[in-house]
Amino acid sequence: MTQANAAQGMGSYILFTVAGTTYALPSDAVRHMEMVEDVTRVPNAPAFIDGVVFSRGQVVPVVNLRVRFGFERAAFDLRSRLIVVQSDGRLIGLVADAAREFVRIPPDAIQPPNEALTGMSGRYVEGIASMGDRLVLILSLDRILNFAEALTVGLAD
């Protein structure tokens, strides 16, 4: 197999951290990343919704992944990133503690999550990749966004 053919079989992901754990999302779902700035609070929003931001000409709801996964809220800093993703034509911003890198992960390095994986973040995990000496939890964007669905519908009205 040539190097080009091997690369075609690999999935491209963006790695980011939340509460010290490395997570990944497929890079084709990520529209762009930016610093977290000027979040406008929304009355009566669920605790995991920080509010909305104006990003590249559009109002985007902001989901705080720390809170969504059951971790303690942390103040934004220079490393905090808003990862703007698109699903079903909707843009949603996901706040991460830091965005690390874009990587390619071969399919054989990804295993399904163990049934014992529990907790708030466990329900969103689609797979676990072994990358050298670290494990990366690959998230299901659909599962994360299904939880935020009611809010995005409400904000769009």
Give the residues covered by each predicted segment.
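An acidic, low-aromatic, low-complexity terminal/linker signal
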Residues: 1-157
